[in-house]
């Protein structure tokens, strides 16, 4: 049985409008909107503007975090969405970002974090019994 503590979505968005991702001013409402749409609990956030263009940001969530980095010169946005609890929250936040950023292609990995908890616990019990 697979047991996990959270869902981690790692994604690269290609072909995104360079003007849309060039500044924190443009990215801020999109990222904050994803947090709201995903019904995530924001603790704090921080954004950084690169010169002449490009942006990075992270939202600390009660459920974990959402972070991004942009490369407008390549039309690239890299995303990290990690949530504990209901996996639908990560999926909803991700879907919101796809809708708002409109990439022409996406590379995605979805990982169940802590999926070996039971297995690790069993191994520890077996090893303790041998000593």
Swiss-Prot record:
Keyword set includes Lyase: yes
Cofactors that this protein relies on: pyruvate
Coiled-coil spans in chain: none
GO cellular component: cytosol
Record-annotated membrane-spanning stretches: none
Keyword tags: Autocatalytic cleavage, Decarboxylase, Lyase, Polyamine biosynthesis, Pyruvate, S-adenosyl-L-methionine, Schiff base, Spermidine biosynthesis, Zymogen
Family: Belongs to the prokaryotic AdoMetDC family. Type 1 subfamily.
NCBIfam families, sorted: SAM_DCase_Bsu
Complex formation: Heterotetramer of two alpha and two beta chains arranged as a dimer of alpha/beta heterodimers.
The protein's name: S-adenosylmethionine decarboxylase proenzyme
Source organism of this protein record: Thermoplasma acidophilum (strain ATCC 25905 / DSM 1728 / JCM 9062 / NBRC 15155 / AMRC-C165)
